[in-house]
Amino acid sequence: MSATLRDVALMAGVHTATAARALSEATRHKVAASTRAKVEQSATKLGYMAHAAAATLRTGRSGFVGMLVPDLANPLFAPMLKSAEARLRTKGWTILIAQVAPHEEDRLTALRTLITKRVDGLILATSQSNDPILTMAAQHNIPTVLINRGLGDRRFPCVVNDDNESMRLTIAHLKDLGHQHFLHLSGPRNSSTGMARLEGFKRWAGSKHAVVEAGNFTRDAGYQSMRAHLLKTPSGCTQTAVVCGNDLIALGAIEAIRESGGDVPNDFSVVGHNDTPFMDLVSPALTTVHVHTDLMGQEAADVLVQRMQAPTSAVPASRLLHPDLVLRDSTAKPRTQKVFKPKR
């Protein structure tokens, strides 16, 4: 027969409630170290394992937090996941991670699965404009925090990078080098980050400059959009600097430039966004905007814990994180020729 919490308490010589507090990550700090050690030793000797369903009935919480991310292979999300998990673990919660496809029904299915696990809260890195998963989360009264993407909906606090500041830093750097003609390869416009960076680009570069929607935050999308832009004008390309929606788009753009007979940075300066791992090891090393993704995960966890512990209180304020521009080898002074004619 499996050991119970009462068995652990009897062996340790403490009240059952004290044993429960000592074995919970969220409350163990409230128990004296010597008492906690006795309880933990007793639990180990008896082979005690907490029963999740019983704990839920006792506390009204499952101890689980759901986190939805669009692409686990994207290195942007690893630091967010790691820091959010570490922070929540210290507060007594375990993260359940779901990777969701862009299709609406797949996203809803993933959220339904988390709801059946009775998650106490959600961290969403997948939010889009008019996203049905937010409607479902609200219908089930699940405390929810948006990470990396914000929608301006006061019901859902967000922890995001200051994308306007990202573009200010980027354009200021390129103008300091002497660039006057810019191209923006934006992310998808149904993404809040894609739109925020596009708006920041227009604000600091001006609305007269060329914008091409990459359609996705991938290397292939960057390649296809840059290649199409280079080939669409028979007389050649007048832009000298390419501002990209993220680092993967930038890598695709560099590939397309090289394939067309161009060079980075001699023919085009290219700037990425996010400073994902290994951008210092590509050739040329990528000038990019560093987003503090580890801090983003930590802050999102803190905001969510605040929401879960006081669900009826005022919604916490969203948090805007300041980026940094990392200068590397993919930017230089503009080429001397006014027009770049691609190899076809």
Predicted regions and their residues:
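N-terminal helix-turn-helix DNA-binding module of bacterial transcription factors
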Residues: M1-R61
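Alpha-helical structural signal in soluble globular domains
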Residues: S42, S83-R87, I133-M136, H140, ...
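Hinge/beta->alpha junction and helix N-cap segments in small-molecule ligand-binding domains
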Residues: A52, P70-P79, I97-D106, C158-L169, ...
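Alpha-helical recognition/docking segments in bacterial nutrient-uptake
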Residues: T59-A172, D176, H229-L231, S235-C237
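Short helix-capping segments at alpha-helix termini
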Residues: T90-K91, H140, W204-A210, T233-C237, ...
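Periplasmic-binding protein-like
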Residues: R118-T126, L183-S186, V212-E213, P234-N246, ...
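Flexible loop/turn connectors
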Residues: L231-R344
